[in-house]
């Protein structure tokens, strides 16, 4: 399952997601595409026309350019995500986003999407084990749900729980 991690540039969360058999949906992959894009003059500082068009699906044209640029870059992550983990109150070492308005809007868009989401508060110190345990439990539940859905599909059982005609 594709799991969006927030902050989307958190290597620590991305590693946890990968260790539990899911695909992390992270900002680094999106930036990598831009760095290799011939359309961009000074990667990764510039954004493309497509980024701006994509951002207009989520924000008004009157919003500041910085917000549109950030949301345009983050939008593909949101569109790919099948589940998400939001780490709140994390220190900048977990992945600084740089713009509070873009942060809040992006978290709102994740919640609005209606995908399975775990919101866990960063507390540090000895509470880290609890945080990692919550993330582990969430990822294991996702794996189990994914396997059950796969088995049901294999047996020809639809989402309603009834056997479908094959």
Regions found by a protein language model. Name each.
Residues 1-166:
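An N-terminal assembly and electron-transfer interface module characteristic of large anaerobic redox
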């Amino acid at each position: 399952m594709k799991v969006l991690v927030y902050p989307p540039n958190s290597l620590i969360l991305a590693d946890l997601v990968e260790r539990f058999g899911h695909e992390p949906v992270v900002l680094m992959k999106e930036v990598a595409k831009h760095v290799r894009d011939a359309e961009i003059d000074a990667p990764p500082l510039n954004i493309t026309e497509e980024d701006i068009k994509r951002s207009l699906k989520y924000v008004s044209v009157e919003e500041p350019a910085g917000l549109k640029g950030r949301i345009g870059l983050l939008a593909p992550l949101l569109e790919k995500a099948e589940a998400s983990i939001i780490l709140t109150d994390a220190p900048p070492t977990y992945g600084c986003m740089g713009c509070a308005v873009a942060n809040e809007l992006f978290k709102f868009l994740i919640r609005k999407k209606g995908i399975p989401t775990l919101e866990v508060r960063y507390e540090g110190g000895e509470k880290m084990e609890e945080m990692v345990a919550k993330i582990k439990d969430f990822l294991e539940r996702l794996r189990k749900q994914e396997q059950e859905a796969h088995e049901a599909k294999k047996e020809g059982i639809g989402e309603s729980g009834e056997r479908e005609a094959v």
